[in-house]
Structures are given as C-alpha cells and as structure tokens.
UniProtKB/Swiss-Prot annotation:
One of its GO terms (cellular component) is plasma membrane. It is found in: Cell membrane. It comes from Picrophilus torridus (strain ATCC 700027 / DSM 9790 / JCM 10055 / NBRC 100828 / KAW 2/3). This is Protease HtpX homolog. It is an enzyme of class 3 (hydrolase). Gene3D superfamilies: Metalloproteases ('zincins'), catalytic domain. Binds 1 zinc ion per subunit. CDD domains: M48B_HtpX_like.
Amino acid sequence: MDLYSIKLKVITILAGIGIALLFSLIAYGLLYYFYGLSGISIIYFLLIFVLFIDIIQWLVSPYIIGMTYRLQKVSPMSQYGYLIDIVHDAAEKNNIKEPEVYIAMRGSPNAFAYSSPLAGKRIAFTKSILDILNRDELEAVAGHELGHLKHHDVELLLAIGLIPTLIFYLGYSMIFSGFGRRNGGSFFLVAIILFILSSVFNIMILGVNRIRESYADVNSAMTIPNGAENLQNALAKIYSYSMPSKQTSNSTVNMLMFSDHIENDLGRDYRKLVEKWKNMKPPVSIFSDHPHPAKRIQILERYKNSF
C-alpha cells in the first residue's frame, strides 16, 4: 500500500469519525440546554428508532435493488458466464471471497457492488456496459467494485448516513416540543437550524463518498494488472456512451455506482477524452457524490506502473 492510498484510507476513517463526533456534540449540547438530562433520552430514542429503520432497509435493500434493476443471477452456463470468471480472478487478486454476480437488464452502462447479512455480497453489471467494455476493462471495473466490498463501504454509508436523518428528526421533534411554551420561538429557530445542519451533513457525506470512490479506483489500479489504464478507458467509454444527466443524489444506491453519468458529449472518441481529462483542471462540486472524471483519470495516471 503506497502513501496516497494510505492517505485516502485514513481520511475516510477520520472523516467518518469526525462527522459522528460533531453530530454527537451538537445533539448533546442542544438537548441538554433545552431539556436537561431528560433530553438525552430523546436522542437515544431517535437513535434506536432511525437505526432500526436503517437496519431493516439494509437487510432488504439487495432485494429492492434486484427488482428495480431487474437483476438476474449469472450462471456459469449462461451467455454472461464469463463475468463469473472475471469477478473470480479479480476477487483472488483482492484476497476476498468471490461475491455473487448479477446482470442488470436495464440502466445505462454501469456497475455496482452491494451487500447485506441476508443477501451476502453481490456485484452487478448492467447489460449495456458489456456492449462497450472489453474483458480487461470489465476486470478493472470489477476491481473497483470489489474495493468497495473490501473497504466495507456499504457499512460506512449506513453508519454515517444515519446522521442527517437523526438531525432532521431532532429538528422535527423540537418544533412540536415548542408548541405552548413561553420560549417556543427559540425551539422553532433551533429546529430550522437543525434542518439546515441536516443538509450540511449530507454535503459532508457526499465528500466522504468522493474520497471513497477515489480509494476504490486506487484499489483497482493496485490489484488488477494494467488496472489503471483499463479503468481510465472504461470511465471514458462509459461517459462517452451514456445519456447525459445532471441529476445528483446522495442515495446509497447512487453512491454505490461506478459512474454518476455527468453531462457528456455522445460519440466522442474515448481516447481523446482520456487525454483531455489528463490535462484539465477538475472542477469541484460539493454536491456531487462522485469525483469529476478528470480527477479520477489523473489519480489513476499515478498508478499506471504500480501493479
């Protein structure tokens, strides 16, 4: 593991811990100020309630994703059986257990990995991505997705994703707590501040996700032969052939995608796109859940001879 990948790992861990600690201090201070010791029981109740909902969602989400994307499990004898071999080879190189492989019958070119205690670990490729990437590029994409599983990114998103929801419910409860009180206006003002803080924490989580995506790219470059160059080509092909979209979401499913499909020029030669991204200054967007492809390409460029 090189210095940059260690840096990405440490930043991800510290960011997650920092977000959790910041939330704890804000929640504890506000509840103690307005409710005294009884306010601490409120946050415990909210934490247990939201945690229960999130765990249920985590357990059943693979089945919901399966229905949404019309996922079909790949069998060795099917026309997509070669995907099992690709994922098997990539999993061996990553020293992790091979996940189940699925094909998504709908959706633009993409891939994603997800897991739960009930469904186990899974990796899915959309049918359209198979039409534009060669075998080596698919293995590089698999190396990226397996990086998410190896780094326990699903669990990380579950943990820190609770925080904006908790802050929102805390603000919601303070609105009702303020009714009929002499200082009800203060409760309402704090509730508005909490709603704003919920959005701020969402932006912070998007930042963590961008780091997480870069770390998965580095994982592919360091574990898959020629992974850096093949992942660069895969990114360029996906952005060249995907329908343009400006939609940004911080949903867990969108965060787990390999690409977020920013607006692009259809039909552009992917090699020219790679060269352009190598030399451009990547724009910064705090509202994006993926790094700009130029930033991803430039990070991968550092790792072309790292395998």
